[in-house]
């Protein structure tokens, strides 16, 4: 008598491996994003476009409600605020930022190593029916972030990331229109500040 294979999502290890395999073979990614912050009775919604390139290169272009730019070349991180004429700069290895987990999507990521106690979320529904929600404790951000939730599509794509912070706030990233292995120049992940811009070394701030 044949034994049916477990339904997708019942085997966490199998699902984690499928997500790993999907992203680890990619060279680059592009997506539109919406970032939603909720905390202290406030809600802040921002949106723009994200580009990722192996290894650890990121470019977040925020367009709404204000323009700002978050760039990593894998070694240095720049956060440019045009309205304030200010550039914040730090080393990637010192980065403790809510955007940083995405930098490790392209490479040799192992989801179960990044998120301790990885399990299926059963007390919440995904935003899109048919997707699966996973939760785990982030190894790299265990201090400021208590839990990370990932919404995974049947095609093993991550379309939503929710970070539950220690102070009770949540930051949610929603991704749409993923494009894989797009041609991206390394120059897209470099930044030269315009004349007259103040440069602040160290913490990137909010």
Regions found by a protein language model. Give the residues of each.
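Bacterial N-terminal signal peptides
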Residues: 1-2
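Envelope-exposed proteins and targeting segments
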Residues: 27-29, 46-48, 54-56, 66-68, ...
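Short hydrophobic/aromatic-rich beta-strand segments that constitute the beta-sheet cores
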Residues: 33, 58-62, 77-80, 136, ...
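An acidic-aromatic
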Residues: 49-101, 171-172
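Flexible, surface-exposed loop/linker segments and immediately adjacent secondary-structure boundaries
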Residues: 85-131
């Amino acid at each position: 008598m044949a034994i049916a294979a477990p339904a997708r999502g019942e085997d966490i290890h199998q699902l984690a491996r499928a997500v790993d395999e999907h992203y680890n073979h990619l060279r680059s990614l592009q997506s539109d994003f919406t970032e939603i912050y909720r905390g202290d009775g406030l809600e802040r919604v921002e949106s723009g476009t994200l580009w990722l390139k192996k290894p650890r290169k990121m470019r977040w272009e925020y367009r709404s409600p204000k323009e700002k730019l978050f760039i990593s070349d894998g070694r240095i991180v720049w956060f440019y605020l045009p309205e304030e004429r200010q550039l914040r700069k730090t080393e990637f290895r010192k980065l403790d930022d809510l955007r940083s987990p995405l930098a490790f999507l392209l490479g040799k990521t192992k989801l179960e190593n990044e998120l301790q106690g990885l399990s299926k979320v059963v007390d919440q529904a995904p935003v899109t029916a048919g997707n699966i929600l996973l939760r785990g404790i982030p190894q790299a951000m265990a201090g400021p972030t208590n839990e990370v939730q990932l919404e995974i599509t049947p095609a093993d794509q991550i379309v939503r990331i929710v970070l539950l912070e220690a102070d009770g706030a949540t930051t949610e990233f929603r991704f749409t229109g993923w494009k894989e292995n797009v041609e991206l120049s390394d120059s897209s992940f470099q930044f030269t500040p315009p004349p007259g811009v103040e440069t602040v070394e160290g913490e990137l701030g909010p």
